[in-house]
């Protein structure tokens, strides 16, 4: 099972709102997910990102790969840096 951390759209037409979820890569974008680990609202200025850092790091250490957009959001929040430092043992 290839696990991805990706966005799941739940907003209405012209008003996108996303959940950051852990899902099997074979599931549809808005389909079943394993766990919800955060939210992303691109309409606010500045954009609103809420992420459960512990759950995200746990899934990434277990082999979950973030999508490109989620990787950018995690970098902006400083989670990718923590993940790389933990992986290198710093």
Curated annotation (Swiss-Prot):
This is Small ribosomal subunit protein bS16. Pfam families: Ribosomal_S16 (PF00886). Disulfide bonds: none annotated. GO terms for molecular function: structural constituent of ribosome. PANTHER family: 30S RIBOSOMAL PROTEIN S16 (PTHR12919), SMALL RIBOSOMAL SUBUNIT PROTEIN BS16M (PTHR12919:SF20). One of its GO terms (biological process) is translation. One of its GO terms (cellular component) is cytoplasm. It comes from Listeria monocytogenes serovar 1/2a (strain ATCC BAA-679 / EGD-e). It comes from the Bacteria. Keywords: Ribonucleoprotein, Ribosomal protein. InterPro entries: Ribosomal_bS16, Ribosomal_bS16_dom_sf. Belongs to the bacterial ribosomal protein bS16 family.
């Amino acid at each position: 099972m290839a696990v991805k951390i990706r966005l799941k759209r739940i907003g209405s037409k012209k008003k996108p709102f996303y959940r950051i979820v852990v899902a099997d890569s074979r599931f549809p974008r808005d389909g079943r997910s394993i766990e919800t680990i955060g939210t992303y609202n691109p309409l606010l200025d500045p954009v609103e990102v809420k992420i459960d850092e512990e759950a995200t790091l746990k899934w990434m250490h277990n082999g979950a790969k973030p999508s490109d957009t989620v990787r950018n959001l995690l970098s902006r929040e400083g989670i990718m840096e923590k993940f790389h430092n933990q992986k290198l043992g710093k």
